[in-house]
UniProtKB/Swiss-Prot annotation:
Its EC number is 3.1.3.5. Disruption phenotype: Cells lacking this gene are viable, have normal growth and morphological appearance under standard cultivation conditions, but have high sensitivity to toxic non-canonical pyrimidine derivatives such as 5-fluoro-2'-deoxyuridine (5-FdU); the growth is completely blocked by 2 uM 5-FdU. Upon exposure to mutagenic agent 5-bromo-2'-deoxyuridine (5-BrdU), 5-BrdU is extensively incorporated into the DNA and results in accumulation of random mutations with high frequency, which affect growth or generation of lethal mutations in essential genes. A 30-fold increase in the mutation rate is observed. This is Pyrimidine 5'-nucleotidase PynA. The active site is at D9 (nucleophile), D11 (proton donor). Homodimer. GO terms for biological process: deoxyribonucleoside monophosphate catabolic process; pyrimidine ribonucleotide catabolic process. Belongs to the HAD-like hydrolase superfamily. YjjG family. The gene is pynA. SUPFAM superfamilies: HAD-like (SSF56784). It is an enzyme of class 3 (hydrolase).
Length: 237
């Protein structure tokens, strides 16, 4: 299969969300006078991941996630806080974090040289993702950035990809590849939309989901090799 349009997930695929989250949380917790910051982080991080999974499964709304995660955090430690206000402060700090994964810029440079059209396709809050992208220096690589909040739908919904396709000139599913680390969002989303996928799996995780990636890679070099192999097969054919 010869691909032209590459849709990239951002967090944990190109952007270092863990580093960004750690800095933003530290700033927020210091602002709130928290003494044992690590204890709060240890509770918040898995709780937040679980809430995002619930959002993917449509068990909760985005508004509920955003407005309650910090009130839940502080409630766990016996404090009553305005979750909505804390969410605004956290988003302010997080939007300033543009840490990228090692090699991300080189990867995108290589793909541009190979004449691919690159697009960002991310679940998230517009103000945060646009801010982080601006800080990261990745914006010039992308023809367009698609954010779930703006599209009013999110991965893994097929509608997310349908709306993206409507905005890309010459778009065809057969020439499109979704690249990301999340089986339940990126890969399942590609499956739902009828789009081929690359599961970026640098930690060699096992797949215990129903999502079926077209390809699986463990590094950026693997990703390039996978795409180069497809080009060679196309030329040979």
């Amino acid at each position: 299969m010869f691909y032209k349009f590459l849709l990239f997930d951002l967090d944990h695929t190109l952007l270092d969300f863990d580093a960004a989250e750690d800095v933003a949380l530290t700033q927020l917790l210091k602002e709130e006078g928290v003494a044992d910051i690590q204890a709060y982080k240890d509770y918040y991080v898995p709780m937040n991941k679980a809430l995002w999974k619930d959002l993917e499964l449509k068990k909760i709304s985005k508004q509920e996630l955003v407005n309650t995660r910090f009130s839940r955090l502080f409630s766990h430690f016996g404090q009553e806080k305005d979750g909505s206000f804390l969410a605004q402060r956290y988003q302010f700090y997080l939007a300033q974090q543009g840490q990228t994964l090692s090699g991300a810029h080189d990867l995108l440079d290589s793909l541009i040289e190979r004449d691919y059209d690159l697009y960002a396709a991310t679940n998230g809050i517009t103000a945060i993702q646009t801010g982080r992208l601006a800080q990261s220096g990745l914006v010039p690589y992308f023809n367009q950035v698609f954010i779930s909040e703006q599209l009013q739908t999110q991965k893994p919904d097929a509608l997310f990809y349908e709306k993206i396709g409507q905005q890309i000139a010459g778009f065809s599913k057969e020439k499109t590849l979704m690249i990301g680390d999340s089986l339940t969002a990126d890969i399942q989303g590609g499956n739902n939309a009828g789009i081929d996928t690359i599961w970026y799996n640098p930690h060699h995780l096992e797949n215990h989901t129903q999502a079926q990636p077209t390809y699986e890679v463990y590094s950026y070099q693997d990703l390039l090799d996978c795409l180069d192999k497809n080009i060679l097969e196309k030329i040979t054919f």
